[in-house]
């Protein structure tokens, strides 16, 4: 049974990696180009997301082999838009430039939805121990939720990449949460960040 389970998980991961490659291949066409946050600005973050996603796939296999099968419900990623970057830079009083954006750790983000709180923390332990990146910090909004009720475990990792023959480390934020937490986060985002349309 475990042999068949491993084969099933492996096939699922192959399809997810293929999907990631297809999305990544067209991402630059969907990324708005501005003076400071153009295609060249996003390139290192795209490379870091691809590397991080593969590391998540490996961690997923380890988690599902040692504990509950299909503990990982979904894995998604996104790159913060230029408008969102500018808004955050303004809130933090940072320069509206690539240099200012270097202080942000969530331009590249990945989200993993897991079946339970226990699976969230176990998955976090696996990620911290992975040689694919360097663990920077964690913000545990599960143990201490935000005032809005938002709950999630955020991990910041430095992902090594090689571009144009030069190596660099790019920060990536990984959000871990359960389906219920994910649903609440979506509701909160719609209420807090979407503009209200006048009738």
Predicted regions and their residues:
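Amphipathic alpha-helical interface elements
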Residues: 36-44, 104, 113-118
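Surface-exposed, low-hydrophobicity interaction/linker segments
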Residues: 44, 48-94
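Short, flexible, solvent-exposed loop/turn segments with mixed acidic/basic and small polar residues
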Residues: 94-104
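Long beta-strand-rich cores associated with HINT superfamily self-processing modules
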Residues: 101, 108, 113-199
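Alpha-helix boundary/capping motif
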Residues: 5-7
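An acidic, glycine-/histidine-flanked metal-binding catalytic module
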Residues: 17-63, 167-199
């Amino acid at each position: 049974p475990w042999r068949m389970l491993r084969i099933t998980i492996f096939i699922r991961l192959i399809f997810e990696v293929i999907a990631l490659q297809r999305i990544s291949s067209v991402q630059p066409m969907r990324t708005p180009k501005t003076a400071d946050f153009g295609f060249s600005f996003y390139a290192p973050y795209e490379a870091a997301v691809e590397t991080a996603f593969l590391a998540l796939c490996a961690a997923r296999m380890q988690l599902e082999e040692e504990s509950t099968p299909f503990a990982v419900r979904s894995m998604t990623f996104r790159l913060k838009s230029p408008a969102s970057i500018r808004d955050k830079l303004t809130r933090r009083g940072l320069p509206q430039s690539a240099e200012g954006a270097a202080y942000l750790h969530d331009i590249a983000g990945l989200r993993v939805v897991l079946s339970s709180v226990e699976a969230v923390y176990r998955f976090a332990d696996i990620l911290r121990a992975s040689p694919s990146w360097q663990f920077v910090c964690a913000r545990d909004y599960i143990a201490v939720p935000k005032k809005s009720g938002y709950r999630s475990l955020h991990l910041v990792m430095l992902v090594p990449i090689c571009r144009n023959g030069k190596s660099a480390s790019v920060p990536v934020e990984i959000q871990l949460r359960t389906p219920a937490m994910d649903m609440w986060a979506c509701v909160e985002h719609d209420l807090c960040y979407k503009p209200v349309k006048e009738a």
